[in-house]
Amino acid sequence: MRTLLLAAAAIGVMSASAASAQTFTFTTLDNPGDPTFNQLLGINDSGTIVGYFGSGAAGHPNIGYEIAAPYTTYTPVMQPGSVQTQATGINNAGLVTDFWSPTNLGPNGQGAPQDANFGAVRQPVGKNFGFIDTTDPLTAGLPQADQTLGINNSNVAAGFYLDANGNSHGYTYNLATSAYTEIKIGGAGTIAATGINDNNEVCGLYTTTKGSMFGFVRNASGGVVTHFRVPGSKTTQLLGINNAGATVGFYVDGNNLTHGLYYIPATGAWVPVDDPNGVGGTVVNGINNKGELVGFYTDAAGNVHGMLVTVQ
């Protein structure tokens, strides 16, 4: 199993510029269950982080976990009955978004996924947990794919599903009303919603009908969509958003190098976020309202490590 992020409204187009005023401090956090493959995907305002270890290749299932400061104890987050679970987001009440699979077949010989995945939210119930199925009923195709990727403090989640033709559709899901709302962007061929803040602003990514990939932020009403693309990049994806509208994600430059990114609303600038050990690339997946970031990087040996970033 792997994250299937994509390999009309009034529109605001944001030109991006680089900035160097930010200082980042990087901390590597790896679950010892597999120190060769960890990804940190979400963080709340208490600094509690969710992620997973295991590449998803056959025999190396994704095992979700939660970890709180001082970041020494990893608590499993596994959907009941699952073989694999990726814990993807967490709000301040401790609700955790995830997607899970009943199998661990790994990709086929052509690299295509064979493991179906389904969206869910883990909810604290007393000293135990309940799991809410968030899989969009429009999910179709083989294998089925629905991924719930983020949740705000009003318990509205964001994610995407694949239709019978393999096209991705972004959505939000309100846990209180069990209502799905599709995210639509004019001119987009495929859409994935990846994060949502307490203002119900949604971030994500889309491909145009010509195959170009952009990040986006959509306001709560859906009437304004701001499109983001780092100049000269081949791909830009936005994966997390906080209440100030600061977004994080990654871009692929003209040399096919992957860089984490952090967007500063006050200046309109992109700031690259590159872990000094991430010679194989850096991705930022989550941001909280204190400006703490989480993600992962690939080292010189090809191992993937979880990453916590503080911003000064």
Predicted ranges, named:
Residues 1-20:
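Gram-negative bacterial Sec-dependent N-terminal signal peptides
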Residues 3-4, 20-312:
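Residue-level hotspots at or immediately adjacent to binding/recognition sites across diverse folds
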